[in-house]
From Swiss-Prot:
Keywords, ordered alphabetically: ANK repeat, Repeat
Cited Gene3D superfamilies: Ankyrin repeat-containing domain
ANK repeats: 36-65, 69-100, 101-128, 129-161, 166-195, 199-228, 232-265, 270-297, 301-332
Protein name, entry field: Putative ankyrin repeat protein FPV232
UniProt-listed SMART domains: ANK
Source species: Fowlpox virus (strain NVSL) (FPV)
Pfam families per UniProt: Ank, Ank_2, PRANC
Keyword field contains Repeat: yes
InterPro entries named in the record: Ankyrin_rpt, Ankyrin_rpt-contain_sf, PRANC_domain
Entry annotated with the keyword Repeat: yes
Amino acid sequence: MLKLYISMFLDSTEHILKEINRLQHKEQRTNGISCIPLIPLHQAVEARNLEVVEALLERGHNVNETDHRYLTPLHIICSHPNKIGMKEVIAEKTKRDLSSYEERAISEACYNNDINIFKMLLLNDGNRTIDDVQLCTIDYDDSIDTKIIKLLLAYGADTKIKTEDKLKTALHYASTNKNYKLAEYLLIYGAEVNSPDIGNNSPMHEAVRHRNEDVVKILLQYGSNTDHMNSCGTTPLHISVGRVLNRNNYSILKILLEHGTSVNIQSSILGFTALHLSIHSEDKLNLLLEYGADPNILNFEKETPLSMAVKVTRYDINIYNRLIYNICLRAFKYPFIKTTEGYIKNMTCINGYPKCKSIKDACEYEIKNLESIKLSPRFSMADFLKDDNSLMMDKIINNDLIDYYYSFMDSFPIYGNIVKKSIDTAKDRYLLIQGAIRSMDNITFPSQRVSWYNMPLEIKHDIMYLLDDKSLCNLIVAEYDS
């Protein structure tokens, strides 16, 4: 079957089909040693030979048959080129060890999902160089993969079949593939988006691990559970901040957070939050804090992100700054946390390091100064730091003192921008509420049957306050549609 496998890459459809007919009576379909498929349909799919795949399906070849590697044709088309199998083929064909050029070319083929490189190697041209490999990659058309998967699915390929050894579905393999259309077609045809493998990894775990942003987005569209834990006790969020994936995965982390993944979920084995794992990366740490990551959570070894960071002196001072800024802000916003074990651990850690204590003192000093800037007997500029201040801001946003003190916020380097952002948000929402009130007034013109028009303005305002921004916008749009 080795000869047929090589033929799948190099020869005409007519020649291949004749060879299949010739070998049919002595077909070898199982071999626990070989890393290449031994079933003709599986070979054709692995060689990305569209014409032969179509011909074999028309002949009635079993689209859901598993080979000795436990793979169906659907698993194969969603996988990267068979690196180990190609090494086996070239070694057997040439009767020698692979050259460094061949080793590198095969790795290049797998990384770029490019079957053309395999074809080039099988031609056995001794004058080829790695530059030829890179040029070859530019010309590869992965739409062939898409055409093959559509063909397999049209002939009844089952998206739910799992490999016997690792319990992986085709979607697990597609989630590692740069061609996001493979995953999309599988989901259209009913693939289970949260199906676990033997390690309880979902397709989302695989997509995040391989930094496959397009597939991450598609999986989310089909309802992927981003809080699903694998057998190592980690979610896709934990994977996205890990050191192993330090490259090119900030955007994936942001996508997961925007979609509402649980930012403070702890791994089930060591109790790490994503924030614990992000102390090596200022960008990721800042993003997690922006989405509500709690720096006072203890892992199972009773360590907070800060207590872990101070033990490693190589971390940038900005890591300590961002964590302590947030710890102090949370203590101001939620005084009850001062009695929690995590906060006490952080304070012990901060007070034990002069550099950290000076940061904490600066935070508390700035908050105290903001509290001293009074807007009314009840409210100060520091109230704009609180999460539960929306009603307060709504009531006093037109206070002239706010505009006056707004320009002074640049002199508050730690929390000034938070205050300014809260003020801007409150003003935008106030204008939105006023616009919605006007639209409602215009829609419900004076009539004895309409009670809205005769309501006091303050009551109208309180009613509109209960609506979110999207509902307010829809109400304004409704005026122009009516």
